[in-house]
């Protein structure tokens, strides 16, 4: 690795440690030319899939958009910021673990709906009404009935 002080190409690793989280490696290095020491970090770089929109255009995944969508649906609902962050993390993990380079936007919408269904039924209905483009009251009633069926314990 190139020395940041003298730009010499040869450095020596003095110490290597894994971070507490286990997701990075810290290396203490010494330049063989100028004898100065410096620290480097190695981390895994994971690329989120590209999002393919309904019109066919492609855009980079933006976690801020995901957060804004969840927060809008959850506006004035009793759900903590930590729960929202955890939901975003689960969605990101599902996208990463899919191994796909591209994901259609509809898949993200479905993941958001699943998370909202777990977090808050009212927020789920809010999001579903926009995401599924509800046209009339009957579609709201169907969605509410579906949520209600999921809450009832099975009869014996």
Swiss-Prot record:
Domain ATP-cone: 49-139
Swiss-Prot/TrEMBL cofactor(s): Zn(2+)
GO MF, one example: ATP binding
Zinc finger region(s), unnamed: 3-34
Cofactor note: Binds 1 zinc ion.
Zinc-finger among keywords: yes
A Pfam family per the record: ATP-cone
Presence of keyword Zinc-finger: yes
The organism's place on the tree of life at top rank: Bacteria
Alphabetical keyword list: ATP-binding, DNA-binding, Metal-binding, Nucleotide-binding, Repressor, Transcription, Transcription regulation, Zinc, Zinc-finger
GO BP of this protein: negative regulation of DNA-templated transcription
InterPro entries tied to this protein: ATP-cone_dom, NrdR-like_N, RNR_NrdR-like
Family label: Belongs to the NrdR family.
Functional note: Negatively regulates transcription of bacterial ribonucleotide reductase nrd genes and operons by binding to NrdR-boxes.
Classification via PANTHER family: TRANSCRIPTIONAL REPRESSOR NRDR
NCBIfam families named in the record: transcriptional regulator NrdR
Protein name according to UniProt: Transcriptional repressor NrdR
Protein species of origin: Herminiimonas arsenicoxydans
């Amino acid at each position: 690795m190139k020395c940041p002080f003298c730009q010499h190409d040869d450095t020596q690793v003095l110490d290597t440690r894994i971070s507490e989280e286990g997701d990075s490696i810290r290396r203490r290095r010494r330049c063989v030319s100028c004898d100065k020491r410096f620290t480097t970090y190695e981390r895994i770089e994971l690329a989120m899939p590209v999002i393919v929109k309904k019109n066919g255009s492609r855009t980079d995944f933006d976690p801020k958009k995901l957060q804004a969508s969840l927060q809008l649906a959850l506006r004035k609902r009793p759900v903590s910021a930590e729960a929202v962050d955890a939901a975003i993390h689960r969605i990101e993990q599902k996208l990463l673990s899919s191994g796909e380079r591209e994901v259609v936007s509809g898949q993200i919408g479905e993941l958001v709906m699943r998370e909202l269904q777990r977090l808050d039924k009212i927020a789920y209905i809010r999001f579903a009404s926009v995401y599924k483009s509800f046209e009339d009251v009957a579609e709201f009633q169907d969605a509410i009935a579906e949520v209600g069926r999921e809450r009832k314990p099975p009869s014996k």
